């Protein structure tokens, strides 16, 4: 075992991981969104977006307009929801309030909001507005997250390739 070679491998791995982290944080700052890239997980927005599409978000708009596709998070639920703005209002403090609906859903999203909420607050609940997408690229992440053997195989492959790398 060559200590110098092992330390070099470890430092390269740290460099790759920290570079990926810094890229993600830089993208988050540029888009003003803690999650600037998301994968569509359901068919509620068909035909506009299919399950597995990768969406690119932007959250620097002061206001959302009726017809915008936004991603929002509901308290106590970790999965972001991709739906279209159906109505837009303002409260007494001039805060924008939004009502959303999936294109492929029969009704609006009020039942999803929870806790007697009838609107989303733009500043608090909206993660971002969709500005672009890549069709079906996200199926890989869906497959890995839904298949425990795929997760283990990927982790094993990455671990073995890191150990066997000579550069």
Curated annotation (Swiss-Prot):
GO BP annotation list: signal peptide processing
UniProt keyword Transmembrane helix present: yes
Membrane topology qualifier: Single-pass type II membrane protein
EC category name: hydrolase
Active-site positions on this chain: 44 (charge relay system), 83 (charge relay system), 109 (charge relay system)
Record-linked PROSITE patterns: SPASE_I_1
Gene Ontology terms for molecular function: serine-type endopeptidase activity
Disulfide-bonded cysteines: none
Chain positions covered by the region annotation C-terminal short (CTS) helix: 153-164
Keywords: Endoplasmic reticulum, Hydrolase, Membrane, Protease, Signal-anchor, Transmembrane, Transmembrane helix
Localization annotation: Endoplasmic reticulum membrane
Transmembrane segments: 13-30
Catalytic activity: Cleavage of hydrophobic, N-terminal signal or leader sequences from secreted and periplasmic proteins
GO cellular component terms attached to this protein's record: signal peptidase complex
Cytoplasmic-side segments: 1-12
Pfam families per record: Peptidase_S24 (PF00717)
E.C. code: 3.4.21.89
Cross-referenced InterPro entries: LexA/Signal_pep-like_sf (IPR036286), Pept_S26A_signal_pept_1_Ser-AS (IPR019756), Peptidase_S24_S26A/B/C (IPR015927), Peptidase_S26 (IPR019533), Peptidase_S26B (IPR001733)
Side of membrane Lumenal, spans: 31-167
Matching CDD domains: S26_SPase_I (cd06530)
Family: Belongs to the peptidase S26B family.
Subunit structure, as described in the record: Component of the signal peptidase complex (SPC) composed of a catalytic subunit SEC11 and three accessory subunits SPC1, SPC2 and SPC3. The complex induces a local thinning of the ER membrane which is used to measure the length of the signal peptide (SP) h-region of protein substrates. This ensures the selectivity of the complex towards h-regions shorter than 18-20 amino acids. SPC associates with the translocon complex.
Free-text function comment from the UniProt entry: Catalytic component of the signal peptidase complex (SPC) which catalyzes the cleavage of N-terminal signal sequences from nascent proteins as they are translocated into the lumen of the endoplasmic reticulum. Specifically cleaves N-terminal signal peptides that contain a hydrophobic alpha-helix (h-region) shorter than 18-20 amino acids.
Free-text domain note: The C-terminal short (CTS) helix is essential for catalytic activity. It may be accommodated as a transmembrane helix in the thinned membrane environment of the complex, similarly to the signal peptide in the complex substrates.
Protein name, per record: Signal peptidase complex catalytic subunit SEC11
């Amino acid at each position: 075992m060559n200590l110098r070679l092992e330390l070099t491998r470890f430092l390269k791995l740290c460099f790759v991981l920290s570079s990926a982290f810094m890229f993600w944080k830089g993208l988050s700052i540029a888009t003003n969104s803690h999650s600037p890239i998301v994968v569509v997980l359901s068919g509620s927005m068909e035909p506009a977006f299919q399950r597995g599409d990768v969406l690119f978000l932007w959250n620097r708009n002061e206001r959302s307009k009726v017809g915008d596709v936004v991603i929002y998070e509901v308290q106590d639920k970790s999965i972001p929801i991709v739906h279209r703005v159906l109505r837009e209002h303002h409260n007494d403090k001039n805060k924008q309030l939004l009502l959303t609906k999936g294109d492929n859903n029969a009704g609006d999203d009020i039942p999803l909001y929870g806790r007697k909420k009838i609107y989303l607050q733009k500043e608090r609940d909206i993660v971002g507005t969709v500005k672009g997408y890549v069709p079906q690229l996200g199926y890989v992440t869906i497959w890995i997250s839904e298949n425990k053997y795929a997760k283990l195989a990927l982790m094993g492959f990455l671990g073995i390739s890191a150990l066997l790398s000579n550069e």
